[in-house]
Amino acid sequence: MNQQGLEDIEMARQMTTNGCYNKAFDLYIMAFEKNVAIKSAYESEFRMVMTQLNEVLMTANKMEDVFINYTRALMTYPNSIIILNDMGKFLFKCGFYEKAWEHFEEALNLDYTFVNAEKNFNSLKNLLVERWHFRMLNDKVRNEAYRAAIHETVIPRVDTILDLGTGTGLLTVYASECSPRITTACDGSKVMSDLATAITQENGCEHCIIVNKLSTEMQLHEAGGKRTLLLTEVFDAGLFGEHVLQSLIHAWENMLTDNARVIPSKAEFFIIGAKCDFLHKRYQLCSPIKEILNVQNMNVHVLTFDETYDCEDVHFYGDDIKYMTEAKSLVCVDFNNCQELKNLIEMDHCEVEMVVQETGEINTVIGFFNLYLTDNVTITTDPRSDRRANAWQQAIFYDKIPVQVVENDIVPMYFSLNGGKLTMYKDDTIIRISPETIRFLNDIEYVNAIAACIGTTCIYLGQMAEMSQITVVDLSPFPVFGLHLLMRGAKSLTCCAKTDSDKEFFEIVFECNNVPLSNITILIGDEWTQEGFKDEKYHAIFCNIFEVCGEIDLRLKAMAEHLKQHHLIQEGLFLPASIKLMGQIVKSNWLDINNKLYDENVSNYKISKHLNPYQVTQNFCIDFSHLEYTPLSDVCVFGTSDSTEGVEVIDVPIIKDGLANAVLCWYIIELVQDLREVTTNRKNCFIDGIVFITDPKIRVYRGQSTPVLRSVDSDGAFKLTMHLEE
């Protein structure tokens, strides 16, 4: 080997040891300039030094220097997918989205099996264009209703239009069919404004102005003067959550003529009491686990994070939901009456009396709305209606404490419009904990599976030491395993709480079960590190490596591996014993329309070519138990959580002809070797499923096999890709 440059490498290593990362970085670059042949041999350690240097610089807020370092690194290693990905992440973090896009795309063009680059690219696309844009634009019921209302209302060559929150500009395109004098469309998102500009131009919309601003930030001259007709669709599941009241009040006061009209002209929000154990378990601690934890009298609900309701596709739930009351109108508003809008936004109390239709229990409250676009055109999101628009989900008011009811009972419910957002009054004193902890504890099947392992665990540990000497780590969202061992006399427990609220709840549970807090160490949040365990050794370690969304948490995975290797007493017990990665090839129209636009659904206007570049290859938080899909393959094992880095092809047997567009993915957890397995593909599991999406669709045939690539990065991140040989 040419020795030139090697002295610089040695000096760079010395500088790194001394913490002089800047000088070390320069010395590596100097060495590579002297001797190009040595670059590949030293790329890994060079990247490590650059990472350390950039961390120091970012801490000092020297972002320009970080950018320069990445630029120099890419000049040296122009085809390094890792450096391209790292620079993309940096640009993403700094808000340079177009440049980040270029770097992720280039990394994937060099190696399409690179998992981290694809995940980062998906995250960027999700940020720039949220998935609901796809489902909304694919909703022909909504689209044709708005189109009909616009045609009914617009006076050709007379009306001037303001399209408030235009998104992709579809309503502006529909309005152009009616020859208005001029249309101004506004949106606060630069990406959506750029898309609207391209789409309106592509589809021949004349006399159209696109403004990249929220309507409430626009000046009158930017709108081109006062308008005679306002179009809007800025509604969420709770109707008012996207600040539509504030936006319309501002528009009436600043942007509209006195005799202007609004589409929709009116809106009405309804609530309905229901029994849905599936939803109840998502948001409140349920009776079975409260009995296990000995906290029967506590009302424990999910942390709200300043949200007053959640949203779900309730129409999928079928027999899992029973509507216990009639639907009752909570709010009806005329968008053409500015004073009514002002009165509504200040409403601090609204009471409705719900009439019970059958004896049973109410444990959740569902909200939906009607949009009266005109006197003749109405859209509903009523989950019971076959004519509903699926662009919007239904609102879930999750703080309703379960109540037993009898047919014809009157159940009062109280709401306010808190800052323009509907809020349901709480029934009673509520303690709040993280969604992760609620979901984990309400997964009774998993909690019972853990409990079923305790006897075997104690026998095994008893062969190592007296129970009073047993030390335990349990890094689950709630330490069910650790609590059982403490109640059997274990010496100590180290566990982790997602939030301070979780920590307080843990302490209450420990005290209710007569477990001394002096025996417990609770780590809080996500900032604790491996170093916090020092040189301690433990007899039993239980780790959770999953995020609620269904993804593997790489930080927790690395923590679990570290604890197993360095902090487990010899012959100690590590749980779970194994985790298998499972999958199945499917056809799902629902997954398709949430990720790909079809022009046939937008009246054959040319929109898909502009929106579909924002398609992603992976979706999270998928509830398989209520997902519409057709299985096309057998269920297959695609690997384990310990699968080695690289790419492996798995041949998947096909059981049904069809066009495949996704691989569903879940896990089988073996808690103790050869003793107990639990699948995560079931209703009420503590984690959701994930899907890997294929576009274009792949035709598969019964009796044949379809190859699926399992790609694993060095950190354990993985993806599945359906693959057909060219």
Question: Where does each model-flagged region fall?
Answer:
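Class I SAM-binding transferase module
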Residues: 2-38, 44-47, 51-54, 59, ...
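Short coil/turn linker motifs that delimit alpha-helical repeat modules in TPR/alpha-solenoid proteins
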Residues: 41-42, 76
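All-alpha amphipathic helical-bundle segments outside canonical DNA-binding/catalytic cores
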Residues: 74, 79, 86
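Phosphate-/polyanion-interacting regions in eukaryotic proteins
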Residues: 79-80, 99-102
